[in-house]
């Protein structure tokens, strides 16, 4: 999922706050800029304050993400290296330095020892768990990946909304599918569902953001039998590389069904856009025309867990983010609404209309449907 940081202008308190993960609670760039200044002031008072270093780095990292920097991949974090260098001078044996040294490497496995050292210093710090999940995915060590996915879930802080959302993504897929994702919230919950609950372990999740690692893509091309292309030779045009990878995976020799999550930007799927069919919270790739309405009915009416869209029994720690993600339900829901309306099936039409209105309201998409669905 592409993280957005566009919010109404607001004035924030001039005090240091613990910077929450941007994937759970995205804030406007002004917030991160102000927090960077506040934490810098704390460091000027005490340059041994590990917590201040942690939040100072995180605020600056999120400023870079929110600024829509054109530099992608690990290189976009080079400008944060000076912060890491200063941390090494002042708090080299801290959890914060070792964890952020790894994080700033952009999943460079030659720096994995820093992540391991951070974990050894404080194995209860939850923010390291996703990094272990990613690192072991790169290493293609599924047993260790699942171990840390379970540790993460056991902490009790994984968003239930994203677990439900990604459960429904998995329910959109045929057996033995390959699913292409792009972000954190459309990938990690899938691995947690597979590891913790054994749900749809037949599905192979491939995050497009990870396919810039030469060894990883080489390993995956052998495992899934699609044509290998070296990302290092395509570094100057990352978008073309991603498109090329999507095309190659779609034509894998194992003939495994291929899907893209709705969270994948269409710029990545341009080469196969005419061969993608909406089947729920994913698009199915098929060279032959398929009856996707029948698949939508089956998936959304028989397999999806949708009650969480209607009622929440407790606060979701990723409330802002999951509400935005839930807007992805609107297109498949409207597709079924149109189908039933044309078929003059009034009860089904009304049921989907009510859910569409509710989801649109909760996700801030009322303007999107106001002229389409009449109250």
Regions found by a protein language model. Give the residues of each.
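Short His-Asn-centered micro-motif
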Residues: 180-184, 208
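ER/secretory pathway lumenal C-terminal domains and tails of membrane proteins involved
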Residues: 14-168, 172-175, 195-375
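Bacterial Sec-dependent N-terminal signal peptides
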Residues: 1-18
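Phosphate- and divalent-cation-binding pockets in alpha/beta enzyme and binding domains
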Residues: 188-189
């Amino acid at each position: 999922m592409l993280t957005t940081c566009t919010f109404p202008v607001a004035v924030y308190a001039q005090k240091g706050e613990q910077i929450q993960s941007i994937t759970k609670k995205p804030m406007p760039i002004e917030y991160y800029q102000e927090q960077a200044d506040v934490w810098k002031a704390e460091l000027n008072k005490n340059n041994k304050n590990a917590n201040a270093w942690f939040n100072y780095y995180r605020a600056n990292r999120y400023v870079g993400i929110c600024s829509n920097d054109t530099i992608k991949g690990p290189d976009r974090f080079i400008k944060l290296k000076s912060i890491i260098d200063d941390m090494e001078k002042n708090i080299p044996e801290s959890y914060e330095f070792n964890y952020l040294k790894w994080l700033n490497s952009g999943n460079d496995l030659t720096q994995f020892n820093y992540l391991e050292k951070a974990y050894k210093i404080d194995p209860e710090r939850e923010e390291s768990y996703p990094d272990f999940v990613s690192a072991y995915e790169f290493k293609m060590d599924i047993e260790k990946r699942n171990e840390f996915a379970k540790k993460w879930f056991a902490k009790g802080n994984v968003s239930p909304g994203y677990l439900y959302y990604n459960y429904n993504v998995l329910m959109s897929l045929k057996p033995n599918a390959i699913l292409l994702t792009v972000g954190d919230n459309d990938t990690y919950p899938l691995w947690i569902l597979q590891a913790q609950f054994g749900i749809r372990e037949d599905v192979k999740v491939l995050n497009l953001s990870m396919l810039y690692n030469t060894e990883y893509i080489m390993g995956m091309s052998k495992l899934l039998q699609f044509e290998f292309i070296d990302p290092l030779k395509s570094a100057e045009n990352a978008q073309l590389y991603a498109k090329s990878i999507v095309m190659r995976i779609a034509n894998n020799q194992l003939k495994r069904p291929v899907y893209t999550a709705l969270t994948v930007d269409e710029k990545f799927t341009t080469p196969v856009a005419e061969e993608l069919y909406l089947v729920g919270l994913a698009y199915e790739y098929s060279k032959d025309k398929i009856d996707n309405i029948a698949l939508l009915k089956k998936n959304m009416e028989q397999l999806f867990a949708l009650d969480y869209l209607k009622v929440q029994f407790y606060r979701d720690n990723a409330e802002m983010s999951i509400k935005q993600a839930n807007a992805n339900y609107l297109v498949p829901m409207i597709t079924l609404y149109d189908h039933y309306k044309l078929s003059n099936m009034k009860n089904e039409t009304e049921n989907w209309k009510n859910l569409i209105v509710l989801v649109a309201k909760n996700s801030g998409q009322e303007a999107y449907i106001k002229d389409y669905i009449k109250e």
